[in-house]
Amino acid sequence: MKEQHNALQLMMLGLQHMLAMYAGAILVPLIVGAAIGLNAGQLTYLIAIDLFMCGAATLLQLWRNRYFGIGLPVVLGCTFTAVGPMISIGSTYGVPAIYGAIIAAGLIVVLAAGFFGKLVRFFPPVVTGSVVMIIGISLIPTAMNNLAGGEGSKEFGSLDNVLLGFGVTAFILLLFYFFKGFIRSIAILLGLIAGTAAAYFMGKVDFSEVLEASWLHVPSLFYFGPPTFELPAVVTMLLVAIVSLVESTGVYFALADITNRRLSEKDLEKGYRAEGLAILLGGLFNAFPYTAFSQNVGIVQLSKMKSVNVIAITGIILVAIGLVPKAAALTTVIPTPVLGGAMIVMFGMVISYGIKMLSSVDLDSQGNLLIIASSVSLGLGATTVPALFSSLSGAASVLAGSGIVIGSLTAIALHAFFQTKQPNSADIKT
């Protein structure tokens, strides 16, 4: 995992990872901030501190030591699972209760990381491959919505947006076809640059936010006031954290497979503890809960660059732009259809890597086929028909609201069931 690159190459590879996750990273604070009634200054702080914490959380995971850090090329960002619960808690108990709940949830994850790490035995290849496929599939609607212009856009589905998005996809594929080596490894970055340049001449690039943004923003503890602790809010946020751990587990196993590393119970424990620390810090600095971002798995697979040094650069860039809002604003000029075009390739690679992980599974086994079929179908169903569980509330709503969780739990439960019926059956080809 420690390929040698010069400083410029590392910077470009790190920038590519940052741009891939940036839209997802700023979307959550924009949604939550608007819903809980933050003013412009507060919203600016929320976006800046979120980017800063994304970088800090990523660096925590890279720092593999005795107590925490999984040491895989993983990028952490704020989890979408937290959006609904944060808005609900803020509306019911006030903004300070949001951060009290995040602090408590992070602390519990840190303390219980050893217990969560023991769950590694429930993730054989037939489960991890299915989960990675589900993660990729669940992201495709996001890619297509972005390609069309972004949900709610006045120009959603316009010919200009569709041509621009698919043009970026085609450009990235052509780079992979005609080039090798470093050019191929930064194809996503080059696609984003080329797409933004084309969008500029189409009148779709706006630099006004860059001009208006400030130069420096310093993180503050308890920016929104001292936290308050409400038991229902804490329980809800703990469920959000558990959902995030499930999503992260699939990412960890995919990256471990890509980097030819076998994950142990201790590795997962340290990964979960680092994630718990990130959630805890997110609460202290009034940011968000954090999870492993799956889109970056696609970039690692596409670029073949598996070095943690690349991701360290990504983390440093995120910390830097979190301190310099003007730099953060510069990345927002990339039009949504351009991001969508790149996402199609990235998320598609996550799906294909899940399929590759399943290639080691005995597909002559009816049990394994049923595990894959049922988990992927239910995961996809919950993603594409979110109203399916609209009658649920509370904890059940949080858990059932994620197709990744539904699919993962299905795969784990079915694998345990078939192993009980046939304890000597093997998952892996011999």
UniProtKB/Swiss-Prot annotation:
Induction: Expression is very low in excess nitrogen (glutamate plus ammonia) and is induced by TnrA during limiting-nitrogen conditions (glutamate). Expression is further induced when allantoin or uric acid are added during limiting-nitrogen conditions. It comes from the Bacteria. Signal peptide: none annotated. It is found in: Cell membrane. Its main location: membrane. GO terms for biological process: xanthine transport. GO terms for molecular function: xanthine transmembrane transporter activity. GO terms for cellular component: plasma membrane. PANTHER family: PURINE PERMEASE C1399.01C-RELATED, URIC ACID TRANSPORTER UACT. Uptake of uric acid. This is Uric acid permease PucK. It comes from Bacillus subtilis (strain 168).
